[in-house]
């Protein structure tokens, strides 16, 4: 069949009038115009005046994290740099601290709410990173939350291990040791 548009072709959007979409087992099986094919036991949904599109894929999320950093927006709007925000106790390290303190249940509940909201906007698949634990037990905790959500939520999740998001505060004086930890301890335990 035809493949997806690439390059400049992506900008050529095609609208079909009097179109139909046949979905079998949750997957688009065929699309056409004119008379709707007769399929035994099919449910017909009148989508006139609506957009029909495949599920959206969010290919870059930081879904699993503790705390909130909304106060940093005000700081940014007042001209503060990331380094100034970090030195004031914000930035990724503040999220790391909150993520480490959060329970599996807290992380899962927060992420599930975000997934529900994303589904409401048409997203059906997300890539979800670890990367705010920055210690073996906490990175594995985040990946376990992602796995559990993938097993029990309607959203499809694809996990990405991001244990080297940054060098955490406790390793600032010994970056090489943190790289060793990621390579020799964390990565072998990621499944």
Predicted regions and their residues:
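Conserved beta-strand scaffold positions in the cores of enzyme catalytic domains, especially
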Residues: 42-46, 159
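Metal-associated gating/positioning segment near the N- to mid-region
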Residues: 47-110
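Residues that form or immediately flank small-molecule/cofactor binding pockets and catalytic motifs
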Residues: 33, 49, 164
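Divalent metal-coordination and catalytic microenvironments
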Residues: 21, 26, 49, 60, ...
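Phosphate-coordination loops involved in phosphoryl transfer and adenosine-cofactor binding
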Residues: 18, 41, 49
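N-terminal metal-binding scaffold of metallo-dependent hydrolase/deaminase domains
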Residues: 1-38
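Metal-coordinating catalytic core of metallo-dependent amide/deamination hydrolases
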Residues: 93-110, 116, 124-191
